[in-house]
Amino acid sequence: MFFDNLAINEMNPGMAGFLVAKKRMVELNGGMQQGIVYLLGAGPGDPGLITVRGRELVGMAEVLVYDALSSAEMLNWAPAACERIFVGKRASRHALPQEEINALLVRLGRAGKKVVRLKGGDPYVFGRGGEEADALHEAGIPFEVVPGVTSAIAGPAYAGIPVTHRGYCTQFTVFTGHEGENKKASSLDLRGIAEAQGTKVMLMGMRKLADVCEALIGYGQEPSVPAAAVQWATTGIQRTVTGTVKTLPARVQKAGLGAPAVVVIGDVVKERESLNWFEKLPLFGKRIVVTRTRAQAGELSARLRRLGAEVLEMPVIRIAPPSNRREFAESVVHAHTYDWLVFSSPNGVERFFQAFFAVYRDIRSIGGARIAAIGPGTEAKLREYGLAVEVMPKKFVAEGLVKACRDAREEIGTIELSTF
């Protein structure tokens, strides 16, 4: 589709300047479009906790390089033509070593791609985002860091545990229980952590939980201090185990908790008894499969998650164009000749008006036809086009729609039913 400069300015006043600048950058780069890599924090698991900027970038990505995320729904936000590359990392199981991931990002950037590196949590909180940024900087590839909500704060919050509380503490320490396998000596200062005041939060440490708790106690940590482990935090399959620094490892083992999980140590864990809001939601702990098309599943999935459910999107239907396109196109062109237009689904409305506006520019060209809809979802879609529904059945099925039309006391005349 061709747009002149005036049309571009009307659509977006800043777009024309952006395109001019982009063209200039390509010229300065020897005719090759300059790529960019976005190091994007996907948040702790719930896709609703990604930042607005983050979701915007996923929707613009040409290449999506992603880890083993808690929610795969984010991948569906990318354009259909977007290349998706899995480089999943969890504990010692890596689809690609970090050095190869760095090289991949550099290669894609040099190829002029708009790359989104989607990382769980925050890219700069034990996410090795700093190493990837270093590699891009050394290669001269432009990059942008988009912070994410870290599970160090969100995980405890969803378990009813604030990491700070004026009644208990005014500081907290975050550390990792997982270090590089090739390191000759640990750089983790467990003595300093044991002596630190306030809340202590450990990420990626479930395999070493017993060793860490034992070491902390050995360095002076009070064994009776409350502690909690939160697995799959912020999702509908979240599980929380509480105890003390001394008892937590055994309780975690008995409950079968594993990675990914966040461990919290401190008196703030006492607040869970009164502040545990998420695990009390009506659908918490329920796994629900949404079989709608990917384009339509998002709103329903989001509503279910807000009620605490774990949602799996598994489309079993696909909206296809009419098999007889010529016949359908002719019926749309002659829409103004009908007395009634009857719509049986929101998809029917969408397809009808895609074809309609390919021919007509004004909604008034639809003529004086009266409008019937099968249900409130279809009615809502028609309202988006400025059309009011005059007939809607009490039962939102095809039989109910036919009966409603029959019950209309005026002569129906010719009916166009948009089912395809």
Q: Residue spans of the language-model regions?
A:
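Short, conserved loop/helix-junction motifs that constitute active-site signature segments
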Residues: 59, 77-79, 193, 217-224, ...
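Short gly/pro/ser/thr-enriched loop/turn and capping motifs at secondary-structure boundaries
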Residues: 72-73, 91-94, 150-154, 171-174, ...
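Short internal beta-strands
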Residues: 60-69, 226-231, 371-375
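A contiguous loop/helix-start segment that scaffolds small-molecule binding in enzyme catalytic cores
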Residues: 2-3, 26-28, 34-37, 110-115, ...
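Signature of uroporphyrinogen-III synthase
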Residues: 45, 97-101, 235-420
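Class I S-adenosyl-L-methionine
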Residues: 2, 26-47, 52-149, 154, ...
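Positively charged N-terminal leader segments that act as targeting/secretion signals
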Residues: 7-20
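Class I SAM-dependent methyltransferase SAM-binding "motif I" and its flanking Rossmann-like core
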Residues: 122-196, 241-242, 391-397
